């Protein structure tokens, strides 16, 4: 695949990360290591993810080397103290996945934890999907065989009035994804099955 260069970093040509803010990110071979609450990346445009009731999918490829006492947020709202302004997925201290969705913007209208832990030291593909009927979080270690970790029934419309941030929620203090690495070749946002930001592996 042909590659392009953005800010001195090579990306695959179908990757749209030109409108991306990288904050104190150490990037080697497209891998971002999260080592503090000041390390994160996000779409620069404030209106990148505004699905307004359409179907959507948010995906990451992540490897966790350990669990922490605080939640390791994979993505969520970047507004300080306002966790409810974007869909969020995190790794809890137990290693379980957690997902939340808010319509009122002040609390989680729907939230649930998985019964299974995610595997450590293994690259995991994780995607959060809304199909207008259910919110589903799936996990795969090979991008082929998927397991449902979380399923939430509900057709509420997510608040989505902040900016989506990956690698934790740096502006909220301790909710960041320390002990994790993200592969930028599979970080993406889709709305109505169209890729609107990032890159999705085939």
Region locations from a protein language model:
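A carbohydrate-recognition surface predominantly in extracellular/luminal proteins
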Residues: 47-66, 83-87, 185-187
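Glycan-recognition/cleft segments
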Residues: 72-101
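Extended recognition patches within non-cytosolic domains
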Residues: 2-9, 14-30, 183-202
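Short carbohydrate-recognition loop motifs
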Residues: 23-39, 98
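Short surface loop/edge beta-strand patches of beta-sandwich-type extracellular domains
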Residues: 35-56, 111-117, 174-176
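Short, aromatic/His-centered strand-loop micro-motif at the edge of beta-sheets
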Residues: 101-125
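Localized edge beta-strand/strand-to-loop motifs within extracellular or lumenal beta-rich domains
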Residues: 122-136
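Flexible glycan-contacting loops in extracellular carbohydrate-active proteins
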Residues: 150-183
């Amino acid at each position: 695949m042909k590659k392009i260069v953005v800010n001195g970093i090579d990306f695959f040509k179908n990757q749209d990360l030109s409108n991306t803010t990288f904050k104190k990110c150490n990037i080697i071979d497209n891998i971002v290591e999260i080592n503090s609450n000041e390390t994160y990346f996000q779409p620069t445009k404030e209106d990148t993810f505004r699905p307004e009731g359409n179907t959507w999918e948010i995906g990451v490829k992540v490897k966790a080397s350990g669990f922490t006492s605080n939640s390791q947020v994979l993505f969520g709202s970047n507004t300080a103290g306002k966790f409810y302004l974007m869909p969020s997925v995190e790794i809890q201290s137990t290693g379980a996945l957690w997902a939340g969705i808010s319509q009122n913007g002040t609390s989680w209208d729907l939230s649930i934890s998985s019964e299974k832990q995610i595997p450590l030291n293994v690259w995991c593909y994780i995607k959060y999907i809304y199909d207008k009927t259910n919110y589903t979080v799936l996990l795969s270690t090979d991008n082929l065989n998927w397991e449902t970790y979380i399923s939430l029934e509900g057709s509420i419309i997510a608040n989505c009035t902040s900016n989506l941030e990956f690698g934790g929620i740096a502006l909220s203090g301790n909710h960041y994804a320390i002990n994790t690495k993200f592969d930028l070749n599979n970080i993406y946002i889709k709305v109505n099955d169209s890729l609107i930001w990032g890159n999705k592996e085939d």
